[in-house]
Amino acid sequence: MSNDSSECSQKLPKLKRILLKLSGESLSADQGFGINVESAQPIINQIKTLTNFGVELALVVGGGNILRGGRANFGNKIRRATADSMGMIATMINALALRDMLISEGVDAEVFSAKGVDGLLKVASAHEFNQELAKGRVLIFAGGTGNPFVTTDTTASLRAVEIGADALLKATTVNGVYDKDPNKYSDAKRFDKVTFSEVVSKELNVMDLGAFTQCRDFGIPIYVFDLTQPNALVDAVLDSKYGTWVTLD
């Protein structure tokens, strides 16, 4: 898709309300750790474009650029539950950064967290979400589900259900779902579209199994796409050239 905003403006979004799942690493770029504001700016710009189109948008961001929680190598010195709690705090840091970057571009945004922090983070309250989204406010969900032993994919599926999302968009560095690992096999085949049943029968890798099952059970399509492509987030809503749709049977 062209970066020309005039071309974008001639198209109408296919989705009205979406849940975008971002990895923490998408904020760190090549440095691999922390937050790189300049590298994150294209994401902010695309979110602004979508809100200008009238798309209602909520985000779930991971914390892997700061700490990967249960995947961190702490040996037996730090319990898994504690490591996961540390990972939840990392998502809060990222969410606050995203909020301020959006506000700096004139985009109204608010953070809701599974665990509140007085004077800093509001506790997530599902009955508020519809009102906030209808105002055109971008919601950023932090703190995971508030429970250890689950991934931010699960947070994304849960929040997608709570807000009644038309789709869950999972931003990755791979342009969709393949029949096998494209990083290992040069003959790997990419799917433009695949059903939930086919994902199960072919044992394809889409996202955390619990999150995948929740989306299937509540009828929420999943779009897996390569965020590193030019204007990929806007394309996900307008054209869907850079990824794979997982849909109901």
Curated annotation (Swiss-Prot):
The Swiss-Prot or TrEMBL record annotates one GO molecular function as: ATP binding
Q: Where in the cell is it found?
A: Cytoplasm
State the Pfam families in the record: AA_kinase
Q: Which reaction does it catalyse?
A: UMP + ATP = UDP + ADP
- Could you tell me which pathway this protein works in? Pyrimidine metabolism; CTP biosynthesis via de novo pathway; UDP from UMP (UMPK route): step 1/1
One Gene Ontology term from the biological process aspect of the record = UDP biosynthetic process
Query: SUPFAM superfamilies, alphabetically?
Result: Carbamate kinase-like (SSF53633)
Binding-site list for UMP = G63, D84, T145, G146, N147, P148, F149, V150, T151, T152
Q: How is its activity regulated?
A: Inhibited by UTP.
Supply the enzyme class, top level. Answer: transferase
The principal localisation class reads cytoplasm
GO cellular component entries: cytoplasm
Q: For ATP, which residues are the binding ones?
A: K21, L22, S23, G24, G64, R68, T172, Y178, D181
| Stored InterPro entries | AceGlu_kinase-like_sf, Asp/Glu/Uridylate_kinase, Uridylate_kinase, Uridylate_kinase_bac
E.C. designation(s)? 2.7.4.22
Sorted alphabetically, the keyword list is: ATP-binding, Cytoplasm, Kinase, Nucleotide-binding, Pyrimidine biosynthesis, Transferase
To which protein family does this belong? Belongs to the UMP kinase family.
Q: What does this protein do?
A: Catalyzes the reversible phosphorylation of UMP to UDP.
Summary of subunit composition and partner proteins: Homohexamer.
Write the protein's name: Uridylate kinase
Please give the organism. Answer: Francisella tularensis subsp. tularensis (strain SCHU S4 / Schu 4)
Specify the taxonomic lineage.
Bacteria, Pseudomonadati, Pseudomonadota, Gammaproteobacteria, Thiotrichales
**By which gene is this protein encoded?**
pyrH
